[in-house]
């Protein structure tokens, strides 16, 4: 049974008055009749829907669609349906400024719209689409299930240091012959060792010299040593030409140590080569900066580069050994320590990884936290995380188990922390609902500046980049995150202006583009499909290379399989979106909505915002409901704004379109355009109710609930001051509509209904549960709407806009604080919260995005196929 409350005005939470009186009002029973009551005096009242008996209770019988949109596949591709006209359908950056880009992107239909396969127009569409992608999905799933301490490529440099370890029993030869065998089998055709696919002079030279030293030390494979020396003689000059940002970790100390080892072995090497002078000078400077006493007492990143360093007190250093026996997870540093001390824990660490990697050890190991964190980041940014929710949850549980209030580094149980992995983990843990404190970043702040490692010599771009991303996920009062955001923003913008967005830890396809997107479109304004489309173009897959002591690759973090799955998935979604948009445009034209000042471009923008947030094929009903409600609500508002309509006329329109059985358009004689809108609204309500997943109460229940949502919205329009519309509040034609709070709430209600979350939609209409959350989200939308209007004014009031920006920022922080933590809050479904978050973020995006950039994103997301 459905009940209606009859408040005298709109509830206070949504801008109306008399909330207490509203709660005291009696209820009417609404059974089979669809005619709503009229309160005493003939004034129209918004309807409020509730289940159960007169006490508002009753058992929950709704069918939760789980965000799936139910039976949308059966209808989403058709343009018309029987009886209905057509198919259903910051610190900086965006916080205060409209993003402007010089080159506009003209958005238009492609010459030949891609046709969907026939199977995409029937109920089996989603299942068959999944079947086509399933091999790639299974490949990725297999990778994720194989994760242990990190998949990582071998380092010839580190393997050479392991090969240099003499037998611990005093007999002649190497302790680890498997390392020698790996070196012998890994020389490249040009005589060098190193990354075969990417030539870096730093990488090739240090790897090659290390391998020549190791083979010479044991008087093995003279021909290979000769080839290696020939390569070094021909390419040593390149060291002076290399970018300093791509210099491997500790190169200034490690390479001169190898040169001295070569000299001691009598190797024919150009020791006086001009390219070596600068390296030796930097070595002396760096050694002078290293606090020798402190490095023996407090764990620092220096422990990672001990090999060849003079004047070490090993008895003191052994106290700083990691629990796995390594020195900060470095095989080369640990091998050097083993040579100097014969320590059993050092031996156990080296022996374990030699066996695991069949002789060729990596430059760092383990890298378990690094891999677990970065995998989740890549899957989410590529837009394919929905296929791997269980695996992602397992990854985040793993990271959370090893999280500490001091931070983390690339491996568990580290006694040295760094900001890059800490920031990435903080961001993902918070987004996934884990309770993490931002005070962790106090460990990386000194004198108003943030750093990655204690004692670092240069600042890493990616460290500050991930710190900025983490700082965007802030709650009210978290000043440390505000400071981190300001500092990282200024650092990154300065490097951007200088054209020096190169990093010392990664050689990626488009790091400058990644940084620019994050600064221009922070978390509040980053829409899922826009982010995915952008990152697909930035992700290098197999070609992304990391910089440690040598170049290395992380095959479960960077690989072609993720990229191929992301491309195919994006293109399949895009093809469906194009088909839906065609139906939506047809619906718009057939209903004559162009006569009200709306344009096909307005429809395109409305659909884009919906599809950019709700993009999954099996959520078509939610996506099209969002777009259609947005278009029609905006059309109705514009129509009555432009005519400066009276309250009586608005009431008459609402009565004819929403209260009369099947709509009484004849009641609007003399107002032809009003009749067109009334008819369109009635038909849309019918269509939405038909295409919503069935519930126990039946289709009539859904139909009435959708009408209640529209009545609530119409009442808000009628109850405006003096019953008149302010023509100045209408946004300029062609601009991206940023809805006010009433329209945002209407969209949220109907999206929830179309998703099958009937109880949640009813709660919103009743506004009796979770009202604070709904009011907050709606208030943010209203502020964004006001900002959009002010930004279009020729006489911009910057003071007012800045004040609104501050209110929006605080509101978004409060919204994030409510949305993100994992709490047992049964008042509002988590998926309903996500609906509100999507709507608010779409408004944030639209209020701050320039028309040029908006059109570019529309082109990329809706029209331009990923190649």
Curated annotation (Swiss-Prot):
Enzyme class, broadest EC rank: isomerase
Requisite cofactors: Mg(2+)
The alphabetized UniProt keywords are: Chloroplast, Isomerase, Magnesium, Metal-binding, Plastid, Transit peptide
Q: Where is the composition biased (Basic and acidic residues)?
A: 51-64, 99-121
Concerning InterPro entries, the annotation shows: Isoprenoid_synthase_dom_sf, Terpene_synth_N, Terpene_synth_N_sf, Terpene_synthase-like, Terpenoid_cyclase/PrenylTrfase
Which Pfam family name is an example for this entry? Terpene_synth
**Compositionally biased intervals (Low complexity):** 74-89
- This enzyme's EC code(s): 5.5.1.13
Binding of substrate, residues: 286, 504
Main localisation, per the record?
A: plastid
Positions of disulphide bridges: none
Bias (Acidic residues): 124-133
For this UniProt entry, what's an example GO CC term?
chloroplast
A single Gene Ontology molecular function, please?
Answer: ent-copalyl diphosphate synthase activity
Instruction: Name its GO BP terms in alphabetical order.
Output: gibberellin biosynthetic process; gibberellin metabolic process
**Function text:** Catalyzes the conversion of geranylgeranyl diphosphate to the gibberellin precursor ent-copalyl diphosphate.
Q: What else is known?
A: 2 different ent-CDP synthases exist in rice, one being involved in gibberellin biosynthesis and the other in phytoalexins biosynthesis.
Supply the name of the protein.
Ent-copalyl diphosphate synthase 1, chloroplastic
- This protein's species is Oryza sativa subsp. japonica
- This chain is encoded by the gene named CPS1
């Amino acid at each position: 049974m459905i009940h209606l409350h009859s408040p005298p005005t709109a509830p206070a939470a949504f801008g109306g008055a008399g909330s207490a009186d509203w709660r005291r009002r009696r209820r009417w029973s609404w059974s089979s009749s669809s005619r709503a009551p009229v309160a005493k005096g003939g004034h129209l009242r918004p309807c409020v829907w509730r289940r159960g008996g007169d006490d508002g209770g009753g058992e929950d019988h709704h069918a939760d669609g789980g965000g799936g949109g139910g039976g949308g596949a059966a209808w989403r591709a058709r343009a018309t349906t029987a009886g209905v006209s057509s198919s259903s359908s910051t610190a900086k950056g965006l916080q205060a400024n409209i993003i402007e880009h010089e080159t506009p992107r003209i958005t238009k239909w492609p010459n030949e719209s891609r046709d969907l396969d026939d199977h995409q127009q029937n109920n089996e569409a989603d299942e068959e689409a999944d079947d086509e992608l399933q091999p790639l999905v299974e490949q990725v799933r297999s990778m994720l299930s194989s994760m242990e301490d990190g998949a990582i490529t071998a380092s010839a440099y580190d393997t050479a240091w392991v090969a240099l370890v003499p037998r611990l029993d005093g007999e002649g030869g190497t302790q680890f012959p498997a390392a020698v065998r790996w070196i012998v089998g890994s020389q490249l055709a040009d005589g060098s060792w190193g990354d075969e696919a990417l030539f870096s002079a730093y990488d090739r030279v240090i790897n090659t010299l290390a391998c020549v030293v190791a083979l010479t030390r044991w008087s093995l494979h003279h021909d290979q040593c000769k080839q290696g020396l020939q390569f070094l003689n021909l390419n040593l000059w390149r060291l002076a030409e290399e970018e300093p940002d791509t210099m491997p970790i500790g190169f200034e100390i490690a390479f001169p140590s190898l040169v001295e080892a070569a000299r001691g072995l009598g190797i024919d090497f150009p020791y006086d080569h001009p390219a070596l002078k600068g390296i030796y000078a930097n070595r002396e400077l760096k050694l002078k900066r290293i606090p020798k006493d402190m490095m023996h007492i407090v764990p620092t990143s220096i422990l990672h580069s001990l090999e060849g360093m003079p004047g070490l007190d090993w008895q003191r250093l052994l106290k700083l050994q990691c629990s796995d026996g390594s020195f900060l997870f470095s095989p080369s540093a640990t091998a050097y320590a083993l040579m100097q001390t014969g320590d059993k824990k050092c031996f156990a660490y080296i022996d374990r990884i030699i066996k695991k990697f069949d002789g060729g050890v990596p430059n760092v190991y383990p890298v378990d936290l690094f891999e677990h964190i970065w995998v989740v980041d890549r899957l989410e940014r590529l837009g394919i995380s929905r296929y791997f929710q269980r695996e992602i949850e397992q990854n985040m549980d793993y990271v959370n188990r090893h999280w500490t209030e001091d931070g983390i580094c690339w491996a568990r149980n580290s006694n040295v922390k760094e900001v890059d992995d800490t920031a990435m983990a903080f961001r993902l843990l918070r987004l996934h609902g884990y309770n993490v404190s931002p005070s962790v970043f106090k460990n990386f702040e000194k004198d108003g500046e943030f750093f990655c490692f204690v004692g670092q010599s240069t600042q890493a771009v990616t460290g500050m980049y991930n710190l900025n991303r983490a700082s965007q996920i802030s709650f009210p009062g978290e000043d440390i995150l505000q400071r981190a955001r300001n500092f990282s923003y200024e650092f990154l913008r300065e490097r951007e202006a200088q054209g020096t967005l190169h990093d010392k830890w990664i050689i990626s396809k488009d790091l400058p583009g990644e940084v620019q997107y994050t600064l221009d479109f922070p978390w509040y304004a980053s829409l899922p499909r826009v982010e995915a489309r952008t990152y697909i173009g930035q992700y290098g897959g197999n070609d992304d290379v990391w910089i440690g002591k040598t170049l290395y690759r992380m095959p479960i973090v960077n690989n072609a399989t993720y990229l191929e799955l992301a491309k195919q998935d994006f293109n399949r979604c895009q093809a469906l979106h194009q088909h839906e948009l065609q139906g939506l445009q047809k619906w718009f034209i057939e209903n004559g909505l162009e006569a009200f000042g709306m344009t096909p471009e307005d429809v395109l923008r409305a659909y884009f915002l919906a599809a950019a947030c709700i993009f999954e094929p099996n959520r078509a009903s939610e996506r099209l409901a969002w777009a259609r409600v947005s278009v029609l609500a905006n059309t109705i508002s514009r129509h009555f704004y432009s005519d400066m309509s009276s309250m009586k006329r608005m009431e008459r329109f609402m009565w004819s379109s929403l209260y009369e059985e099947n709509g009484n358009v004849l009641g609007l004689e003399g107002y032809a355009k009003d009749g067109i809108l009334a008819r369109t609204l009635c038909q849309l309500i019918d269509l939405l109710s038909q295409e919503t997943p069935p519930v126990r109460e039946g289709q009539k229940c859904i139909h009435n609930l959708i009408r209640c949502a529209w009545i609530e919205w119409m009442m808000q329009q009628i109850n405006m001051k003096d019953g008149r519309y302010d023509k100045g509040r209408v946004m300029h034609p062609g601009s991206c509509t940023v809805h006010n709070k009433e329209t945002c709430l209407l969209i949220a209600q109907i999206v929830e209904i179309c998703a099958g979350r009937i109880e949640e939609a009813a709660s919103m209409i009743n506004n009796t549960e979770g009202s604070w959350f709904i009011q907050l989200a709606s208030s943010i939308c209203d502020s964004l709407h006001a900002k959009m209007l002010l930004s279009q004014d020729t006489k911009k009031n910057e003071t007012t806009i800045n004040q609104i920006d501050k209110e929006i920022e605080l509101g978004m922080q409060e919204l994030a604080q409510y949305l993100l933590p994992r709490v047992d809050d049964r008042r509002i479904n988590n998926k309903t919260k996500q609906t509100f978050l999507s709507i608010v973020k779409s408004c944030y995006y639209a209020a701050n995005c320039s028309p040029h950039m908006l059109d570019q994103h529309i082109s990329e997301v809706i029209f331009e196929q990923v190649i």
